[in-house]
Amino acid sequence: MLDKSKRYLIVGLGLLGGKYALELSRAGFHVDGINRSEGHLQYALDHGYIASGKTHDFEDLVRQADHIIFGLYPTALLEWFRIYGHLLKEGCIFTDVSGVKTGLVEPIQAMCRPGVEFIASHPMAGRETSSVEHAAEVNFAPANFIVTPTEKNTPEAVQWARELAEVLGFKHICTLTVQEHDRMIGYVSQLCHAIAVSLMCANDNTSLCEYTGDSFRDLTRIARINDKMWAELFLWNKENLISEIDQFSGALNEMRNALVADDREMLEEMFRLSTQRRAAFDKKAP
């Protein structure tokens, strides 16, 4: 069980950072916040997400924190840690919410002084909306929480990350290496967003909105996207994503070839395979 005498600090009160603050405060933990936007910080204060917070001159909050959760984009997290990482006190264990780990975990762990530990993790619970004002809408229970330890992590830090996930309400918690995580995320998350965005960008289809059915709405739901965040995540994981796009393009081209050749048997075979794999997925899904 997490020690409720420990002080938590959320750096970046966006959608996920705000949700972490909300759930930890509800569970009885002392939570402070740091955020660039005064308006979002005030929202978190007014709604009881955090006990105190600052937009600047926040060094005291960093020094006091026993645990820190970074709700920042990877580039911003690296820059923040280069400037303020020396302020973290001995014994501090901290984590992130980033959807990409390669290029982030190793540099930050290398910058940690003795007695300070970074255990990376990823709550797979993002939404089309952003900002702390929508944090209460996020439901962690059905989502996956992934811990990505390295050889530099202690068993105590890994256990802390798992217990944190439990307090936050996650029901499915797993462990992957950094490389496994980024390969997986390139397929199950980033490729899906790439397909949805490409479908919406293929032509100007706004005139068809009154005719669309559930299939179009379901497939393009995630196309309403945070452009800055997803551009960064795509570029940080571009090797894995390009590989997945190439495989997807190959499968789509097979379907195109079957259509050109009037190959009904090939089409039916593809449909059967997709149905079988989806059924297997449904059985394994938490």
What residues fall within each predicted segment?
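Residues at the starts of beta-strands that form the adenosine-phosphate
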Residues: 7, 30-32, 117, 144, ...
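Short beta->alpha hinge that forms the Motif I/post-I loop of the SAM-binding pocket
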Residues: 36, 72-73, 97
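Conserved short alpha-helix immediately C-terminal to the canonical SAM/SAH-binding motif I
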Residues: 39-40, 76, 101-104
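Rossmann-like NAD(P)-binding element
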Residues: 58-88, 92-93
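Rossmann-like NAD(P)(H) cofactor-binding subdomain of soluble oxidoreductases
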Residues: 80-133
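Internal alpha-helical scaffold of NAD(P)-dependent oxidoreductase catalytic cores
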Residues: 137-222
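Interdomain hinge/lid region at the active-site interface
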Residues: 207-277
